[in-house]
């Protein structure tokens, strides 16, 4: 009867806690290893299998590294502000603060029942004043450096969540949280100037040990391009506007220009005759998402403003249109249209019967079909005819620069980070508005600006804090006159943009962190979390790290040196888990039945860690049986060790065979575990389990050698089944934790066998197997094979045509 279960888990969790086994000591001599899992949102009542898949296997990796001599720092906390927690509170009718703190309490218990070696003394909870004081401090520091600013801008608005969304929170035109179609709305908002770091955010990516797909996503999101900014003057007007283009070589082919419907110039450019049509078009465009507007398959629409622009390179007059395929948020919000050499412009010109003029041909001058979008040679471009695209770009910009009508320009797809939210459950923005003094940052000594409890937070499109008179009404820190507080709260991603720094010095009341401590502990060596954060949290954290570095607080460039994305655990039906589908997996139920280590090992053995897959009850049952089998075999081994019967001191073939499997397993588990290939690491342990079981069947056994083997076996097992391994370790008579033991090292010599098994085939069919010396040459192997009695019988009376030897594996005898 197996003994392992939750009682064993509880026993060793108590031992670890009472003996402070995992308490981090920064003075330890071991090489530091900052291991971090993305902290959890406490928006639901409990942890699910996905949390476990993030935290459990990563903890096993950290345990392995600890036993290899690393001084592991593995803190845990909660990303407690934001829409998920607020929506949960609205759904349940419980105040966000009460529901969030209760959920955290539950999740803490669940995380502790996992048996992970989290450094709970370094815990952070972002919704507590002792944390968001430093979120507000960060805002003030960015404001001081000109990296936080306020402006009126068209923003993404979710009518269901009743709040603004950052560009990164809009997926395929809908809100990533509730899937409601996102619209545009003009609001005065706070932004962080992440674009200031566009070049470095892009250039430093290649040096990071991150998944290539994630790096590619960030590169695309940042979207650096090189081109020219060209100034078009409006005919019969003092107005002018700039366009950004990567194909200034086609400037002579411009036959019209297009402005985004939201462009501020549109109202000034539109003549009365076209006013009604333009206004109607603007309203329709505002209801569409940017994704929809940029769709290649979408039919092109637009309206003429009645005004004309002057092409700065040739003086030609071209009409000014507005169209929704031009976005106010990209470039200048104005596009020079060259229909002969751009597919979207070509479709637009074809529909509205606008001129199409070729200005680029191929090098053979064959006049390829239009639109021709490749590089080539200029035609119909006056003095620039005959130049290649690259030559023309340089010459045309030089010509424009003479009249101050153009210049080389670098552009980014990346937009500044919108951080204002019209919701309650977030860190208040530490700003005061005074009629006399304008925008006044809250003095640092007055932080934190506390979030009031008694607030009506049901979303109605307005900031809930604006309805709380006690909060909003204050006095100006400069002049002492009545003033108003900012009623918006900060995007929760601001809280998570620096939490990895606060962990190191979480009890510091005077600063967000001690720079000396942080610079010693950071960057994070291994970061684990979902790939959905590629263009949000992971990008924002990089920006904040660089900004704090430039302020003198940090001496490193990047927050996370190595990044791993865990896969997704699906329901038993192969679909994403959700309560509505009834396919969710509750870890608590399985832990009660099997124990935390079986649950952990199933997650590591049943799935590739970066891939995930569908949950299987049969799978966890199999792992449970495997642990039971280990328990029986180890008990048998202990009985053999403690018995004086049928033992020996010599190392013979059976011991050499077991020693081979031991060192083969040490090598495999070390290599696979280090690469987070947990499923193959556990498969290696299964091989050693089989070898151990086989050895116990020997008539005479070497008890001392057997003990050495199971000592190493339990050490290898420990990261993957920590409670179970501690119990087995103690049953060997040890009083200290196994996690203070040194990780086994493999001996290459042990992997060289004295003898190897050779399969002998006759005409491709195996007829016998023999053991030969591992260093035997081909002639010796051939001779030994032909001397085998079974082979003699099968070749008698036949002609041996040839004998093929594959050393160390097989012999094939061809007969006729």
UniProtKB/Swiss-Prot annotation:
Binding residues annotated for ATP, in chain numbering: 579
Gene Ontology, cellular component aspect: cytosol
UniProt similarity note: Belongs to the class-I aminoacyl-tRNA synthetase family.
Enzyme Commission code(s) on record: 6.1.1.4
Stated name of the protein: Leucine--tRNA ligase
Short motif 'HIGH' region, span: 40-51
NCBIfam families the UniProt entry points to: leuS_bact (TIGR00396)
Principal cellular location given in the protein's record: cytoplasm
Gene assigned in the entry: leuS
Organism annotation: Clostridium beijerinckii (strain ATCC 51743 / NCIMB 8052)
Keyword Aminoacyl-tRNA synthetase in record: yes
Keyword Disulfide bond listed: no
Transmembrane feature ranges: none
UniProt-listed GO biological process terms: leucyl-tRNA aminoacylation
InterPro entries, alphabetized: Leu-tRNA-ligase, Leu_tRNA-synth_edit, M/V/L/I-tRNA-synth_anticd-bd, Methionyl/Leucyl_tRNA_Synth, Rossmann-like_a/b/a_fold, tRNAsynth_Ia_anticodon-bd, Val/Leu/Ile-tRNA-synth_edit
Gene3D superfamilies assigned: 3.10.20.590, HUPs, Isoleucyl-tRNA Synthetase, Domain 1
Keyword annotations: Aminoacyl-tRNA synthetase, ATP-binding, Cytoplasm, Ligase, Nucleotide-binding, Protein biosynthesis
Substrates-to-products reaction catalysed: tRNA(Leu) + L-leucine + ATP = L-leucyl-tRNA(Leu) + AMP + diphosphate
Chain ranges for the short sequence motif 'KMSKS' region as given in the UniProt record: 576-580
Origin superkingdom: Bacteria
């Amino acid at each position: 009867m197996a003994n392992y279960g939750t009682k064993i888990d509880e026993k060793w969790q108590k031992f670890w806690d009472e003996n402070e086994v995992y308490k981090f000591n920064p003075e330890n001599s071991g090489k530091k290893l900052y291991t971090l899992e993305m902290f959890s949102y406490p928006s639901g009542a409990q942890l699910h299998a996905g949390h476990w898949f993030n935290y459990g296997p990563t903890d096993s990796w950290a345990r392995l590294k600890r036993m290899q001599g690393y001084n592991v720092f593995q803190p845990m906390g909660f990303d407690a502000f934001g829409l998920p927690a607020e929506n949960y509170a609205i759904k349940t009718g419980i105040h966000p603060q009460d529901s969030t703190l209760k959920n955290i309490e539950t999740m803490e218990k669940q995380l502790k029942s996992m048996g992970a070696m989290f450094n709970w003394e370094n815990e952070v909870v972002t919704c507590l004043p002792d944390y968001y004081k430093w979120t507000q401090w960060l805002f003030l520091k960015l404001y001081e450096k000109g990296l936080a600013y306020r402006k009126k801008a068209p923003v993404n608005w979710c009518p269901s969540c009743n709040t603004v969304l950052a560009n990164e929170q809009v997926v395929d035109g809908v809100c990533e949280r509730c899937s409601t179609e996102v619209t545009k709305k003009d609001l005065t908002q706070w932004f962080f100037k992440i674009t200031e770091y566009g070049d470095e955010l892009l250039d430093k990516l290649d040096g990071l040990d991150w998944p290539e797909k994630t790096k590619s996503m960030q590169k695309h999101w940042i979207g650096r391009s090189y081109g020219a900014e060209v100034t078009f003057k409006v005919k019969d007007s003092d107005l002018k506007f700039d366009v950004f283009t990567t194909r200034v070589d086609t400037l002579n082919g411009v036959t019209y220009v297009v402005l985004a419907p939201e462009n501020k110039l549109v109202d000034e450019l539109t003549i009365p005759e076209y006013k009604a049509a333009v206004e109607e078009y603007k309203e329709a465009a505002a209801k569409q998402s940017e994704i929809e507007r940029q769709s290649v398959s979408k039919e092109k629409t637009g309206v003429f403003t009645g005004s004309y622009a002057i092409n700065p390179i040739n003086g030609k007059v071209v009409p000014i249109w507005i169209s929704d395929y031009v976005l106010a948020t990209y470039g200048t919000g104005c596009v020079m249209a060259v229909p002969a050499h751009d597919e979207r412009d070509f479709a637009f010109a074809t529909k509205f019967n606008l001129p199409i003029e070729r200005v680029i041909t191929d090098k053979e001058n064959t006049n390829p079909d239009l639109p021709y979008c490749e590089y080539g040679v200029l035609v119909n471009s006056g003095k620039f005819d005959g130049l290649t695209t690259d030559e023309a770009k340089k010459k045309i910009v030089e010509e424009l620069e003479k009249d101050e009508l153009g210049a080389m320009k670098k552009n980014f797809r990346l937009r500044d980070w919108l951080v204002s939210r019209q919701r309650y459950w977030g860190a208040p923005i530490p700003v005061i508005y005074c009629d006399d003094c304008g925008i006044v940052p809250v003095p640092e000594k007055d932080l934190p600006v506390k979030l009031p409890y008694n607030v009506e937070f049901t979303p109605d499109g307005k900031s809930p804090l604006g309805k709380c008179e006690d909060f909003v009404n204050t006095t100006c820190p400069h002049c002492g006159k009545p003033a108003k507080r900012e009623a918006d709260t900060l995007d929760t991603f601001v809280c998570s943009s620096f939490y990895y720094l606060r962990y190191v010095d979480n009890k510091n009341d005077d600063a967000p962190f001690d720079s000396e401590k942080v610079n010693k502990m950071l960057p994070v060596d291994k970061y684990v979390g979902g790939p959905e954060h590629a263009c949000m949290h992971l990008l924002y954290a990089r920006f904040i790290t660089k900004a704090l570095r430039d302020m003198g607080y940090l001496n490193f460039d990047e927050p996370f040196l190595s990044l791993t994305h865990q896969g997704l655990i699906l329901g038993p039906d192969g679909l994403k888990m959700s309560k509505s589908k009834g396919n969710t997996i509750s870890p608590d139920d399985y832990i009660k039945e099997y124990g935390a280590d079986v649950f952990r090992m199933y997650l590591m053995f049943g799935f590739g860690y970066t891939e995930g897959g569908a949950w299987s009850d049969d799978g966890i049952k199999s792992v449970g049986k495997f642990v039971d089998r280990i328990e029986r075999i180890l008990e048998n081994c202990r009985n053999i060790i403690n018995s004086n019967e049928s033992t020996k001191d010599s190392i013979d073939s059976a011991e050499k065979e077991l020693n081979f499997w031991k060192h083969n397993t040490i090598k495999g588990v070390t290599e696979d575990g280090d690469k987070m290939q947990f499923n193959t690491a556990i498969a290696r342990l299964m091989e050693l389990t089989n070898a151990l079981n086989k050895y116990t069947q020997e008539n005479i056994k070497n008890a001392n050698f057997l003990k050495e083997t199971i000592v190493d076996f339990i050490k290898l097992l420990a990261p993957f089944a920590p409670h179970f391994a501690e119990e087995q370790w103690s049953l060997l008579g040890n009083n200290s934790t196994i996690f203070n033991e040194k990780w086994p090292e493999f001996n290459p010599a042990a992997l060289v066998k004295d003898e190897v098994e050779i399969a002998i085939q006759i005409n491709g069919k195996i007829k016998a197997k023999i053991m030969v010396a591992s260093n035997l040459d081909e002639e010796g192997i051939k001779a030994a094979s032909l001397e085998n009695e079974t082979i003699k019988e099968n070749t008698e009376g036949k002609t041996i045509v040839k004998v093929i030897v594959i050393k160390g594996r097989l012999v094939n005898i061809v007969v006729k």
